[in-house]
Amino acid sequence: MTENNQYLLNLHQRRAPTLENFVPGRNGEVVKVFRELRRGVGPQFVYIFGPVGVGVTHLLTSLDAYQDGRRVPEFKSGETLYIVDDVDSLDPGWAQQLLILQNEVRRHPEARLVCGGKEPIAQLDLPEGVKSRLGWGLSYAIEPLDEEERFAELERQARDRGIDISPEMQAWMASHLPRDMSTLLSVLDEADRLALARHRRLTLPLLREAVDIIEAALGGSAR
């Protein structure tokens, strides 16, 4: 494993998506439904949607549902929770597989299927049969956190670690980084690691260095 891949693995493990570390904001009802799904109860079909960064993939991954390595899993006897992410990008073959999975779940009342995408059901470029089945259950638009909510949560998590985020650092993050919590918390994780390793308090230069390290590991820009 390369050094960059090991770094990304460590970063993923520190920030593995769970319901507990999802910041609900105005999505409290969705989190409640997902807690029910995790217990094997609640609606049989759920569709959630929103732009990249609002938490659709985070929520789906947090369910720890059955996966068989396929773009759309096959129904398997004994497995009761299935997820399909990015339904917007399904090609015709996988869309047909989703329709088959939808029908199988419908025939098994104990089973649950949760799908995610970027657009509301009506705007999806999918066969009508798939779209109508996505509408069998509940549909939620995942609302992004506003700037005040994002930085209030960032400050709360920083305080829990004994970190002080100065107004200067907040202003820099607000103007230079994507506005999703996953990115902000990953930068905080890395900056905290650097500060601890060097026995220094967190400063703006360390914050910038943390972003540079993440970008180098990702092979692209985090900004």
What is the meaning of each model-derived region?
Residues 1-36, 196-223:
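A short, basic N-terminal segment
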Residues 72-97, 101-104, 112-119:
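Conserved P-loop NTPase "ATPase switch" module shared by AAA+ and STAND
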Residues 121-135:
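Short regulatory helix/loop adjacent to the ATP-binding pocket of P-loop NTPases
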Residues 122, 137-149:
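Conserved AAA+ ATPase "SRH/arginine-finger" region at the nucleotide-binding site
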Residues 164-177:
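Short conserved motifs of the RecA-like P-loop NTPase core
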Residues 177-191:
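The conserved phosphate-sensing helix
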